[in-house]
């Protein structure tokens, strides 16, 4: 195995993004660079110098189209973990695309291939004051499921405890998925003025939704010498989420936050 420098890690992530982007372009699927990756595109025209991952955003319907396309094709070096996979690291919250030729140890000591995150936006109520109670309800179920799932996966094999936690985890997973499906029927994106990350705590609930007009369509912005899709209201979104996003953080915060070490296998 070869240990990767930060820049080499970034280039692996960039290759994943290139692969994802090419598939989206081929099938006319929309997405947007998100989070620190979006800041990087606008402020640095590439990675934030100390960043070590890639984030993208997708509307639910575009995400579902992408999943359908992904599993119709074969991918030599890449694997996708969907948000609907009960064994996913962040079931319900996000999807991931992994480069199976690599291995990382993250800040919590967990090992996995290097990956790109896909955050999924659903329609949410047009009245912001009722968004939080609804998100809180759905996230409460998700937290119960996540807690049970951890105990299930850690329990000893071939024990009564393992069997009980298995059944309970699947019950809570089904309940979470059913509730989310009902939510999506009640608040279809096309009829909503706001979109949000219903099951994700990414940034706290106040920052996990935005006016749909920020992400009505996409434009293209430079990132590492390439052109990638970016939401039309990127400035408004980044200002809502980060404030003065063009200002560099304090020097002591200018360091990688996700990966402890990374290797090419």
Curated annotation (Swiss-Prot):
It comes from the Bacteria. Disulfide bonds: none annotated. It holds the Pfam family LicD. GO terms for molecular function: transferase activity. It is an enzyme of class 2 (transferase). PANTHER family: LIPOPOLYSACCHARIDE CHOLINEPHOSPHOTRANSFERASE LICD. Belongs to the LicD transferase family. This is Lipopolysaccharide cholinephosphotransferase LicD. It comes from Haemophilus influenzae (strain ATCC 51907 / DSM 11121 / KW20 / Rd).
